Curated annotation (Swiss-Prot):
This is Small ribosomal subunit protein uS4. The gene is rpsD. One of the primary rRNA binding proteins, it binds directly to 16S rRNA where it nucleates assembly of the body of the 30S subunit. With S5 and S12 plays an important role in translational accuracy. PANTHER family: 30S 40S RIBOSOMAL PROTEIN, SMALL RIBOSOMAL SUBUNIT PROTEIN US4M. Residues 93-154 form the S4 RNA-binding domain. It comes from Chlorobaculum tepidum (strain ATCC 49652 / DSM 12025 / NBRC 103806 / TLS).
Length: 203
């Protein structure tokens, strides 16, 4: 699957959100957009620019390119309920996102690598597709030979239990987790406004 290969730190500074642990540290030192005029940019931002910015936040946070993101939006529209809520719920069900939420990786990019490299099992079967949608009751775990990866142990040691959401039950010792439920929108604490994205695509 194609993925973004540019500077995540620069994108983080432009959007004002941390897209990786490294970017988070960088933003603490330079909390403004990159470039010569990063600290002095002012002026009224157009409605379109605001909508586009929120879309970029969602795409980069979940590591999704435009074509796939638009497909998620179309599916969200076709479902019952609030389109924006449906969109967020689908993104939260992605396997790479769930692996990240479990604390098995400090970033979604790292979680995506764990999936694509074949380290993860879902209900006992290997799944190497990051966009695989996890369902309530699914068990996510590492393959036997992957359970002692140093990077995973390091991530679990650093990730506080408070970061693991209530809709996932994690067994750190055995490198396992159960996806208990699809989260409600208000439970997902991410710095974006999906309603502006819906307005953008509705035009």
């Amino acid at each position: 699957m194609a993925r973004f290969r540019g500077s995540i730190t620069k994108v983080s500074r432009r959007l004002g959100i941390a897209l990786s642990p490294k970017a988070e540290k960088y933003l603490e030192r330079r909390p403004y957009a990159p470039g010569q005029h990063g600290q002095s940019r002012r002026g009224k931002v157009s409605e379109y620019a605001l909508q586009l910015r929120e879309k970029q936040k969602m795409k980069y946070l979940y590591g999704i390119l435009e074509k796939q993101f638009r497909n998620y939006y179309k599916k969200a529209v076709a479902q019952r309920g609030v389109t924006g809520d449906n969109l967020v719920k689908m993104l939260e069900r992605r396997l790479d996102n769930v692996v990240y939420r479990c604390g098995f990786s400090p970033s979604r990019a790292g979680a995506r690598q764990l999936v694509t490299h074949g380290h993860m099992l879902v209900n006992g079967k290997k799944v190497n597709i990051p966009s695989f949608l996890v369902s309530p009751g699914d068990q996510i775990e590492f393959r036997q030979k992957s359970r002692n990866l140093d990077a995973v142990a390091d991530s679990l040691n650093k990730v506080p239990d408070s970061r693991i959401p209530e809709w996932i039950q994690v067994d750190k010792a055995n490198r396992k987790a159960v996806f208990l439920a699809i989260p409600e929108r208000e439970a997902v604490q991410e710095p974006f406004n999906e309603q502006l994205v819906v307005e953008l695509y509705s035009k």
